[in-house]
Amino acid sequence: MEGSSKGLRKGAWTAEEDSLLRLCIDKYGEGKWHQVPLRAGLNRCRKSCRLRWLNYLKPSIKRGRLSNDEVDLLLRLHKLLGNRWSLIAGRLPGRTANDVKNYWNTHLSKKHESSCCKSKMKKKNIISPPTTPVQKIGVFKPRPRSFSVNNGCSHLNGLPEVDLIPSCLGLKKNNVCENSITCNKDDEKDDFVNNLMNGDNMWLENLLGENQEADAIVPEATTAEHGATLAFDVEQLWSLFDGETVELD
């Protein structure tokens, strides 16, 4: 280093060194600090001479506590510039950067931190609204009705089952299951045939009764035509029910 290589003195300044530095600055003025140690006859580096003059020996330096106006200005400048003490001291006449930094760290730093914390807490309380529990609202989505056919049996999805067996067929409801309608084709066919036979008998009886009443009123000349009507072939009637087409003369 510069001091160790040249054997320069370090540490506290003596009163003799301070007087030599004052005489040199009064004679040659401030500046050209690299020539000050040689002119003053000091075994100090140029940086040490400059800092000693600017921080302690300069006549315009103010000593003592800062006034209220200076403290207010210091707070504003620190909020704007941060810890740039040399820039802050340049805006406080008669105050050095070292004095401003020491005063801040000793008297104002703790108060500033506490005030900042309080302001942040107030902002959080103002910005964040009181949290209220969110109420969940159940939404019922409509389900489309679909008609599905499974194994020859029909039912509506999502709806109670409907009895799809016509009452005219005479089928019992014992053949209906919980989920689908089961059908027995043989029993259904037998019931269907029995119903048809019962209907045929009733139709023939009604037909015969009407013919008998007509015989009592119509003259004997129409008996031949009535006999021809009664001679309707039963086999042709059965063929009609079986699905065969028969041409009648």
Curated annotation (Swiss-Prot):
One CC-aspect GO term: nucleus
InterPro entries per the UniProt record, alphabetical: Homeodomain-like_sf, Myb_dom, Myb_TF_plants, SANT/Myb
GO BP: regulation of DNA-templated transcription
Gene Ontology MF annotations: DNA binding; DNA-binding transcription factor activity
HTH myb-type domain span: 5-57, 58-112
DNA-binding interval(s): 33-57, 85-108
UniProt entry tagged with the keyword Transcription regulation: yes
Keyword annotations of the record: Activator, DNA-binding, Nucleus, Repeat, Stress response, Transcription, Transcription regulation
Induction comment: By sucrose, nitrogen deficiency, ethylene, UV light and drought.
Tissues with expression: Expressed only in leaves and siliques.
Compartment list: Nucleus
Signal peptide positions (record): none
PROSITE patterns the UniProt entry points to: HTH_MYB
Subunit structure: Interacts with BHLH12/MYC1, BHLH1/GL3/MYC6, BHLH2/EGL3/MYC146, and BHLH42/TT8.
Role played: Transcription activator, when associated with BHLH12/MYC1, EGL3, or GL3. Promotes the synthesis of phenylpropanoid-derived compounds such as anthocyanins.
Record-given protein name: Transcription factor MYB90
Record organism: Arabidopsis thaliana (Mouse-ear cress)
